[in-house]
Regions:
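Catalytic cores of extracellular degradative/oxidative enzymes
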Residues: 104-186
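A short, solvent-exposed loop/turn motif at the edges and junctions
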Residues: 50-52, 66-78
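Surface-exposed loop/turn motifs at beta-strand-loop junctions within extracellular Ig-like
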Residues: 10-12, 68-70, 95
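A short, amphipathic beta-strand motif
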Residues: 2-11, 21-23, 62, 91
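Short, surface-exposed beta-strand/beta-hairpin micro-motifs centered on an aromatic residue
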Residues: 43-46, 50-57
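A short, solvent-exposed beta-strand micro-motif common in secreted/extracellular proteins
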Residues: 21, 45, 59-69, 128
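Extracellular beta-sheet/turn segments enriched in Thr/Pro/Gly and aliphatic residues
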Residues: 79-99
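Short, ordered, surface-exposed loop/turn motifs in non-cytosolic proteins
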Residues: 12-37
């Protein structure tokens, strides 16, 4: 096995930055650090990263995708890992727009963590930083009596994970079991 160590940072400031990371090994399998928080649910798998990661991959081709919010260019790279190699990667993310400087602030007001979610509190803590959201709203939802992980949170602002730059709120979706086909969100 080869070990990949990645350092993610803002290309302009040089500051470490949080991002989501997708790594595929030579067999086409998703790889993540053993202790990482994973995105659970449909779509491309990724792990949340607060700036540095380390993981092992078998020898062969490795594809890496690093993404942060909507204002940064995705960083894609491919490399070849030889057995027992130690690969140190510097992963600079380039910002293509600075919308907050124009008084536009990114956010997501419609997030669910489904019944398969294993670390909802860690994920809600990381979500605004990895996506660079100023506002994050996680929705409570009742559908087919599934135990949505997001339903474990109390309604209102989550002061324990909100910061001066990232507000995390728990809202309730206005569609439930009785008429789920007629809902319009929060």
């Amino acid at each position: 096995m080869a070990t990949i160590r990645g350092t993610i940072f803002d290309a302009t400031s040089g500051s470490p930055t949080a991002a989501k990371v997708h790594v595929l090994d030579s067999t086409g399998h998703f790889r993540a650090p053993a202790d990482s928080v994973l995105k659970i649910g449909p779509g491309r798998p990724f792990f949340y990263c607060e700036g540095n990661f380390e993981l092992d991959v078998p020898r062969g081709a490795v594809d890496i995708l690093v993404e942060r919010g909507t204002e940064y260019e995705p960083l894609k790279l491919s490399l070849s890992a030889s057995p027992q190699a130690n690969i140190d990667l510097e992963l600079p993310l380039k910002r293509w727009a600075d919308l907050p400087s124009q008084q536009w602030f990114p956010g997501n007001t419609h997030i669910h963590y489904d019944e398969k979610e294993q670390q909802p509190h860690e994920r809600v803590r990381l979500e605004p930083h990895v996506h660079d959201f100023s506002v994050t709203v996680v929705s409570i939802l009742q559908r087919n009596d599934l135990p949505y992980a997001s339903n474990r949170f109390p309604l209102g602002v989550m002061n324990d994970v909100s910061t001066a730059h990232h507000v995390v709120d728990i809202g309730e979706e206005n569609r439930h079991n009785a008429s789920s086909h007629m809902g319009y969100g929060h």
